[in-house]
Amino acid sequence: GVSRDTISRVERGDASVGIGTVLDICGEFGLLGKVGAAFDPANSELGKIGLSRGVPKRVRKAQDASPEEWRNNMNWYESSFVYQIYPLGLCGAPWSNDGSTQGATNDDDHRLLRLVNDGWVEHVSRLGATCVMLNPVFESDAHGYDTRDYTRVDARLGTNDDLKTVVDAFHEAGIRVMFDGVFNHVGRGFWAFQDVIAKRADSHYAGWFNIDWNGNSPYEDGFGYETWGGVPYLVKLNHNNLDLNDYLAGVIRGWESEFDIDGLRLDVAYCLDPGYLGYLRRIANELTEKRDEKFILVGETMFGDYNRWMSDDACDSAYNYEAYKGLWSSMNSANMHEIAYALERQSGDKPWDLYTGKHLLTFVDNHDVPRIATQLTDKHQLGCLYGLLFGMCGVPCVYYGSEWGIEGAQSFGDHELRPALDAPQWSELTDLIAAFAAARLQSEALCMGDYHELQCQPQQLVFQRSCAGKRVIVAINAASQPTTLHFDAGCGRAVDLVTGEDHDFGAGSEVGAYSCHYWLCER
């Protein structure tokens, strides 16, 4: 049973009470009306400093905002939990676009509305995500990264009005929305490139591409052109052309104005010229000033020094592929030293650590890599792996369907990674991820804190996150057997933010098989 003292703490909105305890109370005592305050962002640590979950109604004018509201508007991304959706896949769109479906007659013409009608908005909210990242939704030749028209929703998905409905639904649920900005290249069906094919050097848009008029293409165009990665159907854009850059700036402003989006994922940001990234930063700053809320840029990066793409003159955040590899590889090889090395190198307290105080996008899978349930050798480790994801530095991102453990490999291209799904499902894994997300949202230390390793063994990792005098110890046991951990906690007792249980460090810390704990240390 649940003690009366614990119930009183929930009724007072005590942020140290874990989500597991709250769910127990809901089921045991029927206190749904009383427990809401416990996870009201206004009553959490982050809510008190203005870093709570996204709100449906933004404070539009700076002069009307309290200091806390203004801080929430400017810093919302740092405490976010991002949920990634690949709409062309999830909504069951045909693999190629013949342009015949124009959103006029039947349900298949409005596939995008499945996100609203099939319960995905409610699912994402229940999971605890505070931002949705939508992969390409605009007119393209096939997979979305081969754009035809930046201003019209893909005919296979529906209409611009459908997209507005989806974005509005997420906003009403308190969830921000980011679009996928594919500005490095376009498809051959892009209207301006089609004009070049028709008019050749006489086309007004010839300068938008890097054309070799003495060459040829695999499509026998009578001229060659620069591509992305040598893929002939992906035509590289020439960002030395000011007309092109002005056009794309208008696209971004139009997306923000028409759909009220909150930021952009920048596809293959590692391929974009630093000067063009700076140009995009200036556009984002302009929109930030207009909105009185940070307009976020998240750059897709692979490896190397992410500071090249993550700065005041470029992206706010970057993809953390270094940690991605370490996360699953450490589990499969029973070598937690691999991910521990990456975390210390990236976010530790040494002068040479690379990204301390910054917020990389962290993930265990996405639309370009195998599903984590396929990647892991021992699927029992999924829970503690997600616990590590939400406990480490960075902004966690979960890819649709992976929260209940769907599988997918790249054996025959990427289609298996981007499946059509009906209504979302809920499982023990989903429940656990929601608990980790709720615990993280309560804790300024887990969202904003620094990183300090306390212990690392082949299948165990213990580290500390600290911020504003608060300390949370994250303990991972990826082994199939329980164990007892011995380390210097710097305090005698703690409260588990996930379960709400008290913990005594005195005789060592007993942890179960495949477990993760977030211990909020007492002073």
Predicted regions and their residues:
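Carbohydrate-binding surface patches
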Residues: L454-D488
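DNA major-groove recognition helix of helix-turn-helix/homeodomain DNA-binding modules
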Residues: G18-A37, D180
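N-terminal structural segment of carbohydrate-active enzymes
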Residues: N73-F179, N184-V186, W191-D195, G230, ...
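Short, charged recognition helix plus adjacent turn
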Residues: G36-W70
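C-terminal beta-strand-rich structural cap/linker in extracellular carbohydrate-active enzymes
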Residues: F505-R523
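Aromatic- and acidic-residue-enriched segments that line the glycan-binding/catalytic groove
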Residues: H143-A155, F183-G222, M310-E322, E416
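Aromatic/acidic polysaccharide-binding cleft in carbohydrate-active enzymes
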Residues: D312, K358-H380, L385-S427
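Active-site-proximal helices and loops of the catalytic beta/alpha 8
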Residues: V167, H171, I197, S257, ...
